[in-house]
């Protein structure tokens, strides 16, 4: 059973919520404006300027080249609230009159997150906060090197004692209106790999005097799936996705080389290191057994995204006090988010906010039966306007949980 927040926290929560309600109409308009004018990773300055100009009385500090942060509240310890600035290289197909018209789209909900953080800052400016609140408008979440890596590496937050870093992400796989917190790992570590097999070219009619890299690649592809199913504990989520395979120039030519690339996703650190080593062994043995040579390059990506136990325990009662249901079974996935890097400087909390499609978005009859399956990074993904308020209130609860953490 969730315990009620103490009197002072409950009172501050109520006051913040009142001010938040007043800020929401402008936040909804801002969300549409941001959505209509998306910027790709590394080119987010117009979006950042739009948000910065909507906070005219707050001093902005540039971070990670195209992002910025603002601070309100007392000096000293502060809770950081993160929202992402970048969009995706997609052509939007939502059909709404405020859709983007170019080759970029907010198909991951970042427009919702930005508007929600703006609304929270507007509300928080009007009350006496117990600890500082840093609004971090972060660029380059969708690419590597990521914005979070730049923020952490630059020590831009070192001037303040960071109590916690809080984020929220819309998630269509969570029931609409429900928020999932969940202690421990909630997103996977993700590492990219590229494998090249060097064989010996030849005529397709004479494979015995060539070294064909294609069947070697095929054996590696199936062998990788066996590494997951036969060397990893079955209750440990792990995924190896091979997203690209390249070899050859013509049907009757055995190519000199072939290449494949993909991503390793793991929810346990020991599985991460095991699969790195096992893939290298598998590839080199498969190549050597057939007279070929191999190159294996594994690029370490985002670490596990881990929710701090204390932050979850403090946030859940606040969400409940706001009338927001907390997921009984926490949402976890093998997706990855650069938010995980903030654990290097402070405890972290990522909340997954359940959303549904905006009913105003037209949808074709062919898609009607699969509408509930429209997910992140889809050209028709468009959370309803209610998502802005739900994300903002979730971030508000996360901020107050961080403030309580400072007292413990």
Language model: regions and residue ranges:
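Acidic/His- and Gly-rich active-site-bordering loop/insert found
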Residues: 2-107, 111-131
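Metal-dependent amide/peptide-bond hydrolase catalytic core
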Residues: 2-5, 218-408
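Histidine/acidic-residue-rich, glycine-tolerant segments that coordinate divalent metal ions
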Residues: 67-68, 88-90, 95-105, 111-112, ...
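Non-cysteine beta-strand/loop elements that form the S-adenosyl-L-methionine
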Residues: 80-82, 193, 351-354
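Short, small-residue-enriched loops and turns at beta-alpha junctions
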Residues: 37-42, 88, 142-143, 249-251, ...
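Buried hydrophobic packing segments
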Residues: 51, 116-124, 148, 217-220, ...
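Divalent metal-coordination and catalytic microenvironments
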Residues: 34, 81, 110, 135, ...
């Amino acid at each position: 059973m969730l315990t009620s927040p103490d009197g002072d926290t409950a009172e501050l929560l109520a006051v913040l919520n009142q001010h938040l309600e007043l800020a929401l109409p402008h936040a909804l308009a801002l969300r549409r404006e941001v959505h209509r004018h998306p910027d790709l990773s590394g080119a987010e300055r117009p979006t950042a300027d739009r948000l910065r100009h909507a906070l005219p009385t707050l001093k902005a500090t540039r971070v990670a080249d195209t992002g910025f942060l603002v601070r309100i509240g007392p000096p000293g310890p502060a809770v950081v609230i993160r929202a992402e600035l970048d969009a995706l290289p997609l052509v939007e197909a939502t059909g709404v009159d405020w859709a983007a018209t170019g080759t970029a789209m907010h198909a991951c909900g970042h427009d919702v997150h930005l508007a929600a953080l703006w609304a929270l800052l507007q509300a928080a400016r009007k009350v006496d906060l117990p600890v500082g609140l840093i609004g971090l408008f972060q660029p380059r979440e969708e690419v590597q090197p990521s914005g979070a890596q730049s923020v952490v590496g630059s020590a831009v937050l070192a001037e303040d004692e960071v109590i916690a870093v809080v984020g929220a992400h819309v998630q269509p796989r969570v029931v609409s209106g429900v928020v999932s917190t969940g202690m421990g790992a909630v997103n996977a570590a993700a590492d990219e790999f590229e494998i090249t097999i060097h064989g010996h070219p030849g005529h397709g009619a004479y494979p015995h005097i060539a070294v064909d890299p294609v069947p070697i690649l095929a054996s590696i592809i199936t062998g990788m799936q066996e590494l997951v199913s036969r060397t990893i504990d079955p209750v440990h989520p792990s995924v190896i996705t091979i997203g690209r395979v390249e070899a050859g120039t013509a049907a009757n030519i055995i190519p000199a080389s072939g290449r494949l690339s993909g991503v390793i996703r793991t929810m346990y650190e020991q599985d991460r290191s095991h699969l790195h080593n096992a893939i290298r062994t598998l590839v080199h043995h498969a190549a050597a057994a057939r007279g070929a040579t191999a190159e294996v390059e594994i690029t370490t990506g985002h670490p596990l995204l881990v929710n701090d136990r204390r932050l979850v325990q403090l946030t859940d009662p606040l969400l409940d006090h706001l009338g927001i249901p907390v997921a009984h079974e926490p949402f976890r996935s093998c997706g990855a988010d650069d938010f995980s890097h903030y654990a290097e400087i402070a405890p972290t909390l990522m909340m997954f906010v359940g959303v549904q499609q905006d009913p105003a978005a037209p949808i074709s009859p062919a898609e009607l039966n699969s509408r509930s399956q429209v997910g992140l990074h889809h050209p028709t993904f468009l959370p309803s306007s209610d998502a802005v308020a739900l994300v903002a209130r979730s971030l508000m609860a996360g901020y107050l949980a961080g403030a309580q953490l400072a007292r413990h």
